């Protein structure tokens, strides 16, 4: 009886921890190790199991976008147009020259044509039979000066025509005497025949009578206006021969372009 009790007591005693062995799996590895070495199975639905790809940086994306935006601009950018005019024809060959487009707007041609109907300007052009103050090149310079001054076309009046014509004579003519008669046509409208006055005679006449002194004050005012007109053009009074030809080519059949000194007999 005592031996039986002793065996029962020994069977209920706890075994040492070292003698316990972990539970083995069917493969012979501990369960804990098997769990650690497991490969993850398929992920949840809707989740990409592949590792995420490395996306391009924002700077690189922006460069790509800039390059793609520049391509249509390069394709759509218009090339500068050139104007070619046929100059001579020789058999089947044609010689052409390039001509730049005139910057004079049509409204300034209209202002010029309107002022040609002024009675005082008509008398000046009719009087100048020798074309000493109003040949075709000087009149073309008037249109160029209208364009450079930049006033609206409806603001140009008789005084502006005389200012531009006088300034054109200053630039192109060496003889000072003929252009002095422009003053008399502007301020003395009743005269139909005015002799060409030299500078000395002009200086003498202004001291002889009160009327001449009045004209002297008007001439001084005219020269003041001429200076203001010259400044409004930003002091650009020189006009090239090419530009003068372009102005005449706008309306080549205009009657003022027949005022050529080369055609005088």
Curated annotation (Swiss-Prot):
- The domain of life is Eukaryota
Any single GO molecular-function term of the entry would be:
acetylcholine receptor regulator activity
> Acidic residues: which segments have biased composition?
66-80
Family annotation (Pfam families): Spy1
Map out region (Disordered) in residue numbers. 1-80
Q: What does this protein do?
A: Acts as a modulator of the nicotinic acetylcholine receptor alpha-7 (CHRNA7) activity.
Task: Please report which protein family the annotation says this sequence is part of.
Answer: Belongs to the Speedy/Ringo family.
Q: State the protein's name.
A: Speedy protein E11
Gene behind this chain? SPDYE11
């Amino acid at each position: 009886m005592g031996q039986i009790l002793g065996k029962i007591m020994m069977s209920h005693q706890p075994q040492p921890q070292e003698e316990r062995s972990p539970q083995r799996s069917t493969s012979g590895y501990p369960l804990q190790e098997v769990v650690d070495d497991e490969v993850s199975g398929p992920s949840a639905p809707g989740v990409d199991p592949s590792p995420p790809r490395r996306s391009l940086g924002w700077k690189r994306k922006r460069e790509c976008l800039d390059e793609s935006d520049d391509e249509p601009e390069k394709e759509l950018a218009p090339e500068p147009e050139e104007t070619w005019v046929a100059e001579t024809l020789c058999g089947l060959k044609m010689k052409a020259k390039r001509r730049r487009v005139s910057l004079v707007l049509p409204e300034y041609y209209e202002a010029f044509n309107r002022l040609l109907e002024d009675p005082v300007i008509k008398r000046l052009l009719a009087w100048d039979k020798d074309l000493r103050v109003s040949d075709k090149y000087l009149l073309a310079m008037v249109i160029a000066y209208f364009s450079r001054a930049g006033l609206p076309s409806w603001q140009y009046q008789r005084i502006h025509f005389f200012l531009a014509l006088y300034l054109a004579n200053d630039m192109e003519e060496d003889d000072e005497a003929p252009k002095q008669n422009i003053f008399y046509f502007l301020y003395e409208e009743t005269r139909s025949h005015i002799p060409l006055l030299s500078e000395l005679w002009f200086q003498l006449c202004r001291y002889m009578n009160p009327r001449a002194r009045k004209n002297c004050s008007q001439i001084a005012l005219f020269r003041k206006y001429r200076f203001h007109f010259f400044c409004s053009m930003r002091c650009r009074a020189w006009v090239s021969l090419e530009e003068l030809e372009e102005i005449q080519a706008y309306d080549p059949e205009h009657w003022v372009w027949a005022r050529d000194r080369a055609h005088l007999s």
